[in-house]
């Protein structure tokens, strides 16, 4: 199966704020520009029977609704950062960020989810998938899906900096094709 992962448009939040699972909308201009950029590129896949899924968070569903009929799935949501949500990264105590960096898979940032827990729900979504799909979601979700599809250790994936831009597309095969 082919998976086309799409990161949501830029959210309507100040730069430098931790927003993980907070249900903030996409910025209006970013949404219209993102739709204009993606609609033509995704049209052939959607017209050929790819199913459309979305994280239930507004910054994703707003784009998905412009692309077509979609199925929201909570397993596609971004990581919950607990008490860190909607706080400036600069206001989160350094010792807490350092504790997360020392245990990327099992530390609970702000008392929220662990990376391992997010990976388990993402894996569950992938395991149930039976058809080609376009998935509107988040950079964290996309990175975990890519790691799972590539058979990459989660620790290695979690340690990589995020380079996925807003409205960027990532194409994967699932299950991964054997060589």
Please place each PLM-identified region on the residue numbering:
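Short beta-strand scaffold positions
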Residues: 54-55, 120, 136-137
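Generic beta-sheet signal
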Residues: 3-4, 50, 128-140
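Short, solvent-exposed loop/turn segments at secondary-structure junctions
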Residues: 10-12, 58-59, 77-78, 140-142, ...
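Active-site-proximal alpha-helix that buttresses catalytic centers in soluble enzyme cores
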Residues: 2-67, 113
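Domain-level recognition of soluble alpha/beta enzyme cores
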Residues: 152-178
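Active-site catalytic microenvironments for nucleophilic, acid-base chemistry
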Residues: 66, 128, 148-152
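GST superfamily/GST-like fold recognition
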Residues: 139-143, 168-170
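Phosphate-handling substructures
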Residues: 67-121
């Amino acid at each position: 199966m082919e998976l086309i992962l799409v990161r949501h448009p830029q959210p309507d939040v100040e730069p430098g704020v931790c927003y993980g699972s907070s249900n903030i909308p996409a910025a209006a201009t970013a949404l219209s520009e993102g739709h204009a950029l993606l609609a033509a590129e995704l049209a052939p896949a959607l017209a050929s029977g790819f199913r459309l899924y979305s994280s239930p968070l507004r910054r994703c569903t707003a784009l998905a609704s412009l692309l077509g009929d979609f199925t929201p799935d909570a397993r596609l949501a971004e990581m919950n950062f607990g008490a860190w949500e909607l706080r400036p990264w600069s206001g989160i105590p350094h010792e807490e960020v350092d504790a997360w960096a020392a245990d990327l898979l099992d530390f609970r940032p702000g008392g929220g989810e662990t990376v391992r827990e997010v990976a388990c729900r993402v894996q569950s979504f992938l395991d149930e998938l039976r058809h080609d799909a376009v998935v509107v979601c988040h950079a964290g979700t996309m990175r975990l899906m890519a790691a799972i599809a590539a058979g990459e250790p989660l620790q290695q994936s979690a340690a990589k900096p995020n380079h996925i831009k807003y409205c960027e597309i990532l194409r994967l095969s699932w299950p991964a094709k054997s060589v």
